C-alpha cells in the first residue's frame, strides 16, 4: 500500500547516505560489513512500510544486523526517522526493488527474510508480482544461508493459500503454519511483533495468517 507523500522525507533520506542506500546499481556489489561496521548476522524485511516491525526487531536484537528493503521514499524516511531517534546502528535502509534482492546480497549471507503483509496482487495476470511467486523464492534461496528461513504474515486468505501452494510446489519445508496467529499459544503470541497493518487488521477481528518455511539443504 502506497503511503501519502511526506515532503520532508526526501531531504531526510538524502541527508543520511550512511543509513540509506538509494537505488543501487544491481551490478555493483554492496559491502554490508562496511556499512554496518561488523559481520553480524543479517536479516531482511522485504517491504517494511512505516517500519514498526523492523525497528522493534533491531532494538530487541543489537547482536544482529537488519536491512529494511523498501521502494517508497516516504516509507524510507519514516523508518529512518525512527532509526535515528532510537540510535539503531544495526539497521540499514535499502531503497530498491525486491526483484533485485539477489543482486543486493551475496549468496548464502542472510539468516532470515521477512515478508509482512505484502501486496496480494489478486488478479491472475499479476501473479508474477507476488513476493511468494516462484521466481522470488528462487532469489530468496540464493541469498539465504542453508540454515536460513522465510517468515511470512498476511491478513489475506487468498495470498496465504497461494503462498503455501507456491512454497510447497517449490519443495520448501514448513516449520510453522497458523491460520489465526493471534490466538496461538501464549508463548507464540508474546514473541510476535506486530506491523502497523497487522495491528489494524487484528483490531477488526480479522485472522492473521503466518508461516515459517525453509528450503531443502543440499
Curated annotation (Swiss-Prot):
This enzyme's EC code(s): 2.1.1.33
Alphabetical UniProt keywords: Methyltransferase, S-adenosyl-L-methionine, Transferase, tRNA processing
UniProt keyword Methyltransferase present: yes
Keyword tRNA processing assigned: yes
Region (Interaction with RNA): 125-130
Chain positions recorded as S-adenosyl-L-methionine binding sites: 45, 70, 97, 119
GO cellular component, one term: tRNA methyltransferase complex
Reaction(s) catalysed (UniProt annotation): guanosine(46) in tRNA + S-adenosyl-L-methionine = N(7)-methylguanosine(46) in tRNA + S-adenosyl-L-homocysteine
Any GO MF annotation of the entry: tRNA (guanine(46)-N7)-methyltransferase activity
Active site residues of this protein: 119
Signal sequence annotation: none
Short name of any one Pfam family annotated for the protein: Methyltransf_4
Pathway assigned to this chain's UniProt record: tRNA modification; N(7)-methylguanine-tRNA biosynthesis
Function comment: Catalyzes the formation of N(7)-methylguanine at position 46 (m7G46) in tRNA.
Protein name: tRNA (guanine-N(7)-)-methyltransferase
Amino acid at each position: 500500500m502506497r503511503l501519502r507523500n511526506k515532503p520532508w522525507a526526501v531531504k531526510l533520506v538524502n541527508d543520511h547516505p550512511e543509513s540509506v542506500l538509494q537505488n543501487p546499481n544491481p551490478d555493483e556489489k554492496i559491502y554490508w560489513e562496511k556499512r554496518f561496521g561488523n559481520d553480524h548476522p543479517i536479516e531482511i524485511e522485504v517491504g517494511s512500510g512505516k517500519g514498526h516491525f523492523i525497528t522493534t526487531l533491531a532494538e530487541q536484537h543489537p547482536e544482529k544486523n537488519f536491512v529494511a528493503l523498501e521502494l517508497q521514499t516516504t516509507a524510507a524516511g519514516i523508518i529512518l526517522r525512527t532509526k535515528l531517534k532510537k540510535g539503531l546502528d544495526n539497521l540499514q535502509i535499502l531503497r530498491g526493488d525486491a526483484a533485485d534482492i539477489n543482486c543486493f546480497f551475496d549468496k548464502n549471507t542472510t539468516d532470515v527474510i521477512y515478508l509482512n503483509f505484502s501486496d496480494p496482487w489478486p488478479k491472475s495476470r499479476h501473479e508474477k508480482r507476488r513476493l511468494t511467486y516462484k521466481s522470488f523464492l528462487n532469489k530468496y534461496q540464493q541469498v539465504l544461508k542453508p540454515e536460513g528461513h522465510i517468515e511470512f504474515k498476511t491478513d489475506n486468505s487468498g495470498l496465504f493459500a497461494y503462498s503455501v501452494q507456491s512454497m510447497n510446489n517449490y519443495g520448501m519445508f514448513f516449520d510453522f503454519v497458523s491460520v489465526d496467529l493471534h490466538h496461538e499459544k501464549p508463548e507464540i503470541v508474546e514473541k510476535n511483533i506486530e506491523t502497523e497493518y497487522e495491528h489494524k487488521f487484528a483490531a477488526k477481528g480479522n485472522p492473521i495468517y503466518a508461516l515459517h518455511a525453509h528450503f531443502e539443504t543440499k
